């Protein structure tokens, strides 16, 4: 597939890394096996997509089996993250979480993350084409900035 470069794969790794670090930080404060499994599945799904793009960029081979786990792993990972939060609802200091989220500058980064993820959802539904390099660049830039905003929001929240 034309235009799938090593650079695209490396940019695709940014949101996977940012999200992974974010999940490690949250997991250190919310020790839940379900949360950890969900985070691991989500990150592994992203790693599969990065690996697919790396192979495309380096060897010019389309190993679609590397890309296929992305959606099911991400969806099941996010579902487990949500279930873990619901199951651990009473164990979470929601007042503390809320105060951290609305603190400045964290709230700016969290707001940007939510907006960018909403835009990403719209973009993937309406414009994204998996086989188009330009479409992948756009999606990865949106996702890289969004996941970095999540990480910065968490870091500034303390």
PLM region spans:
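Polytopic alpha-helical membrane-helix bundles and their juxtamembrane interface segments
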Residues: 1-41, 50-158
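Conserved phosphate-interacting/catalytic interface
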Residues: 47
């Amino acid at each position: 597939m034309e235009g799938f470069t090593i650079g695209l794969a490396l940019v695709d790794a940014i949101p996977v890394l940012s999200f992974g670090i974010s999940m490690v930080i949250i997991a250190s404060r919310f020790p839940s096996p379900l949360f950890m499994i969900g985070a691991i599945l989500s990150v592994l799904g992203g790693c599969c997509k990065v690996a697919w793009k790396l192979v495309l960029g380096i060897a010019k081979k389309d190993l679609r089996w590397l890309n296929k786990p992305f959606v099911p792993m991400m969806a099941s990972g996010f579902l487990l993250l949500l279930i873990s939060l619901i199951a651990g609802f009473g164990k979470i200091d929601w007042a503390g979480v809320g105060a951290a989220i609305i603190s400045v500058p964290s709230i700016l980064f969290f707001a940007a993350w939510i907006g960018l993820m909403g835009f990403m959802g719209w973009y993937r539904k309406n414009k994204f084409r998996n086989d188009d390099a330009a479409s992948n660049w756009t999606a990865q830039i949106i996702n890289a900035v969004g996941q970095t905003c999540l990480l910065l929001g968490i870091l500034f929240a303390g």
